[in-house]
């Protein structure tokens, strides 16, 4: 009923190869006729040409790891696309009107405020996205963020602060008419 091509890796493929992969999945796996095929990607390695190739092959949902729209927050994370580029790409994807378009947002990022999270959620709604996933920052071994925490260069948000981030995002989503499907 669902196939998830995740981790951002699929968008590293050429459009032709991405289409071949999705076509092979549709042809060789026992999928239901209404099977959702999600393609997770990174904006800097994804373009409308790849999106069209994936959609032509049968992808039905595109999920992008935006994390935050704020350039001040994105830059230290190594995100290559600017706020304007992210917004433009998402608007173009939505305009294709051929798949559900969703994004991942992260709260608890360095320099982020609860209002930043709320603004990101409002921006998603304003773009006409089909949904969003709101995740707490997860400090992963070997990443620059965890290294900064270990060296005392960054303090991670504590439970109360994380709660404030989540509450701001949830309130903004509710104000936009979105309802949570899981917490």
Show where each model-derived region lies:
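C-terminal scaffold of the Radical SAM
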Residues: 1-183
